[in-house]
Amino acid sequence: MANKVTGSTDTSGALTTAPSIMKSILVVGTKKENSTTEIKENTIFGITGTADAKAAFGDNAVVEKIVKVFIQNGADYINGMILGSSETAMADALEASMADKSIKVIIPEGNDTKTIAALKDHLALCEKNDMFRYGVIAPTEEASATQTTLIAYGKTVDSDRIFIPSTLPTLNGAVVDPQVAAAGLGALIMTETDDPALPMNGVSMAGYSGLSRTMLETEMKILANNGITPLYLEGTAPTVYRLVTSCVTDESDHKVWQEGTTRFIADYVLETNENMLRANYKRTKNVVRILNAIKGDIKINMEKFEAAEIIENWDEATLTVTKDPQDMYGALVDYEFDVVTPLYTITITQHMKL
C-alpha cells in the first residue's frame, strides 16, 4: 500500500456569481427650523445616522424617522436632498439627483399628487437614460382604510417602478406617517434584491410594532392583483405577502410588470450588460472582430445569469450583434430570455446600441 498520496483540488469552476451593482437610497424632504448644517437645496449629501438627518433637515420629524427605518432595515448607503420652495421643487430635486447614478430607491417625505406625478416622470426619464430606479409611496390612513379605497388609490399611482404598501404600520400603538411606512418597503428593495429573482415574499420589516389593520389571505390576493403590495404580521413585524408594482391600468403592461421580481430582473440584466460593454469597449474599431467579442461577452454574462437562476430559457440563438446601418460607428445588440412568475412565463427582449 502506498504510504504517500498527493493531490489537489481545483475550485476554479465551483462558484458562479453575477456582478453586483452599487446602489444607494435617497430621502427628499424640506428643511425645517433648527437645522445646524448649511446644505444647499437640490444637493446630494450623505447621511450616516439620524443625527445627520436632524442636522440637515432640522425639526423634520418625518425625515428623521424615515432615516431611522432605513438604518433599522440594513440600508447603509443613505443620501439626502433638501427641497426648494418653488412650485416645481420636487421635480427640480429629482432631476438634480440624476448626478448620482448609484441611487436606486427614492423616498420623498410627502405622498401628495404633485409629488407622485413628479416621481413618476422622473423614474420614466431615468429609464430612458439607462438609470434604473424605484420609488415607494404609501397611502394615507384614509386611503388605506378599505380594499376599495386602496385599489382606487393604486390607480392614481399606476407605475411599474413605484410600489405601494397596503397597510400603515404602527409603532407603540400609534399609526406612523405614510412615508415612514414607505421607508420600510424601500429599504427592503435596497437590501433584499442583490439576487433580483429572489421573491420578497415573507420578508419582514424592522422599526415597527404592528399594523393598523390586518387582512384575510383572499383580501391580500385581490390587492396584489390590483397593484398594491399586501402586508401581514409575522409576530409583530409587518411582512411582505407579495411584492407587486402599481402598474394596473394597461392590461398588457400589468401582466408583464406586475411582479416586482420581473422589473428587478429586467433592469439588472440590462444594466449589468451595459456596464460591462462600457468597461470593455471604451475605444474600439467597429469591425467584425470587435462585434464577435461583444457577442462573446454578452453570451458569458447571460450564461452566468441563467446559472444563478436569475433568468430562464436563455437561447444563444436570440443573441445578435450587428453594425448599425444608420450609424457607421454604432453596433446593435439584441437578445431574449424568460422570466417565470407565479402566473406567467414572460419573454423579455432587450436592445442596446453602442
Regions found by a protein language model. Give the residues of each.
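Surface-exposed assembly/interface segments
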Residues: 1-354
